């Protein structure tokens, strides 16, 4: 009985991982589907059109970082359906941004 307990503890200690891998998950800024394109835009006209929309200059880590990237160039962070010729059709706020 004592041998079983000691053997089980020893086996449990050996089975424990020595190093844990850091897990990274993709950042979800814009919902999948239609509004999947993150853009920085000057003006959001009632969620229908975003004027002077450009792609972020770097890959955002999260929603606040996305907002900061766009704010550096004087624009607003938005998710768009179809960015064409610096205009984006159907825009909304990214997930996690309140203003």
UniProtKB/Swiss-Prot annotation:
Disulfide bonds: 30-79, 40-70
Induction remark: Shows the highest expression in the down of developed fruiting body (DFU) and low expression in the other stages of fruiting body development.
InterPro entries cross-referenced by the UniProt entry: Cerato-ulmin_hydrophobin, Hydrophobin_sf
Residues annotated as signal peptide: 1-15
Record CDD domains: hydrophobin_II
Gene Ontology CC: extracellular region
Record Gene3D superfamilies: Hydrophobin
Pfam families documented for this protein: Hydrophobin_2
Keywords for the protein's UniProt record, in alphabetical order: Cell wall, Conidiation, Disulfide bond, Secreted, Signal, Sporulation
Subcellular location, record wording: Secreted, Cell wall; Secreted
Subunit structure: Homotetramer. Further self-assembles to form highly ordered films at water-air interfaces through intermolecular interactions.
Family indicated by similarity: Belongs to the cerato-ulmin hydrophobin family.
Function: Aerial growth, conidiation, and dispersal of filamentous fungi in the environment rely upon a capability of their secreting small amphipathic proteins called hydrophobins (HPBs) with low sequence identity. Class I can self-assemble into an outermost layer of rodlet bundles on aerial cell surfaces, conferring cellular hydrophobicity that supports fungal growth, development and dispersal; whereas Class II form highly ordered films at water-air interfaces through intermolecular interactions but contribute nothing to the rodlet structure.
Name of the protein in its database record: Class II hydrophobin 2
Gene: HYD2
